[in-house]
Amino acid sequence: MPYILPRSFCDTKQNVNIISQASDLKPGSRKVCVAIGMFDGVHLGHQQVIRQTIEDARQHEGIAVAITFDRHPNSVVAPDRNPPLIYSLSQKLRVIESLGIDTTLLIHFDKEFSQIPGEEFIQGLARDCGAIHSLCVGSAFSFGHKRSGNVVLLKRLGQELHFIVHGLASVSLDGRTVSSTRIRESIGAGNLDVASQMLGRTYALAGTVIRGDQFGRQLGFPTANLDPHDLVIPPNGVYAAHAQVQGRFHRAVVNIGTRPTLQNPKPKLQVEAHLLDVSPDLYGQEMEIAFVEKLREEQKFSSTDALQQQIQRDIEAARRLF
């Protein structure tokens, strides 16, 4: 899959309409069309659910609402099975909005929320949102305390509360189901093209730029150090990449790894981006990195001089790709 800067990576809009409780929606006389899901990665299957909701809203002059969560439910109910996320929360919200959703209801998923039975959750949603016209989910969607709710329950509640339920079948690509789990596996294995195909856009890693130990600057190659909190990370190595930060795009060389040349007794996985030709102050900013090509594996060098020389070769190799 050729590298493309897709709309979702290029979209720098920050005017996402987000509410934290259903009673804040205030649709007036408009019908409410709802999509519900974790939507990690907002992949092709998620997009199908969201677009069905948008279509319903447009056909009935309603409002399209996405309901999602601020963390993975497993982080609360099953921490030992909590997966790393594909997207940061801000990434996810931006991509959902870019699809055409009018409002996103972002639910804080905590212990108290996890105890709400599925039926009670939907009844409360219908009460607080006003006139729900339709509710769209994936066919395998489950919800409520101990995952007690499913599409069958939704359809029963839809009959009682007078809303339409869409339980959409999963999307397949090359004969296999598109899922967040498969995308995480692809990213972790370095199959970023496969992940991008399932996402429907070029995969990008996001995180906040944090203060590092200035080692790159000492070598003459200052880096923006990323804190990709709780996210799945591509394999260790050196990559040519594009970085988006503060609404601007920069060519970059990115190192993912533990910097073995430094012989740190407590090595820590780091994501470091050297932006070519610029060295802005980016601390505290969110950066997105879209990987163009892996240049080499991470390796241990005999000296910092040897490391400097290799970094210069990496930069030259990256420039030839842009």
Listing of model-derived features with the role each one plays in the protein:
Residues P2-V32:
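Positively charged, low-complexity intrinsically disordered leader regions
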Residues K26-S88:
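N-terminal catalytic cores of NTP/NDP-binding nucleotidyl/phosphoryl-transfer enzymes
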Residues H43, I96, L135, A195, ...:
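Residue-level signal for inorganic ion chemistry
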Residues A66, L106, V165-L168:
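A structural preference for short, hydrophobic beta-strand core positions in alpha/beta folds
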Residues S75-L161:
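N-terminal Rossmann-like or analogous alpha/beta NTP/dinucleotide-binding catalytic cores
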Residues G158-G257:
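Glycine-rich, Lys/Arg-enriched anion-binding loops that position phosphate/diphosphate groups
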Residues G212-F322:
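Phosphate/ribose-recognition catalytic cores of enzymes acting on nucleotide-derived substrates
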